[in-house]
Amino acid sequence: VSRGLGDVYKRQMSDTDAKKLVKNVTDQLKTVSPISGYNSYNFDYLDAYQKMGMRERHVISPYLEKQDYAAGFVAPDEDVSIMINEEDHIRIQAFAAGMNMQKAYTLADKMDDVIGDVLDYSYDQKFGYLTTLPSNAGTGMRASYMLHLPALAGNDKISGLIPEVGRFGLVLKAMEGDNNRALGDIYQLCLLYTSPSPRDTERSR
């Protein structure tokens, strides 16, 4: 789930603005339940190897790993991660085992409500939640699966599969490494554009 704050998009921020955002958001969220029970981190105190380890555990994104000024919170069992200064000001990430997309959505949705009660999200009545990338605007939510595909990768079928899933508005990409042969043969299948939330789907029926 991607959320912007205020009128300045993440990519327009100066280093000074980025530092202020990290401090202000961290200070506002660290006392809020259940975030107060999460593990916190700040890139000011992490070296490159620590960041890489967090990225390999998928508690931070590859994009966040490359930022100079960032912080966040991670649930004790690492099923929920809150990233500050990712592609947008706030990125909420939730995991669930198996194919349980509903559970992952519920975790992310609850955390979105918690943070939304504390911070003022950028929102427009016509366009929904405003984000750095237009493709993320609206609900600001993207659903994805992590897939282990050793047979397809070993038989060089992935490169042919990528354009096929694209016809259905999906993206298939390597979690690590080259798309033709991802490290560990682990791939991510995700929506090209933001998803409608279950709430919106229910209202449209």
Predicted segments, located by residue:
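Single conserved hydrophobic/aromatic residue that forms the stacking wall/gate
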Residues: 1-9, 193-204
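Conserved phosphate/anionic-ligand binding catalytic regions in large, soluble enzymes, centered on
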Residues: 129-145
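Signal/transit-peptide handling
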Residues: 115, 143-173
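N-terminal low-complexity, intrinsically disordered segments
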Residues: 17-82, 98, 102-110, 155, ...
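Flexible, glycine/charged-enriched surface loops at secondary-structure junctions
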Residues: 35-41, 120-129, 171-179
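A structural-propensity feature for long, helix-poor, extended segments
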Residues: 161-195
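Residues forming anionic-ligand binding surfaces in small-molecule and nucleic-acid pockets
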Residues: 3, 7, 81-95
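Short, hydrophobic/aliphatic alpha-helical segments
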Residues: 107-131
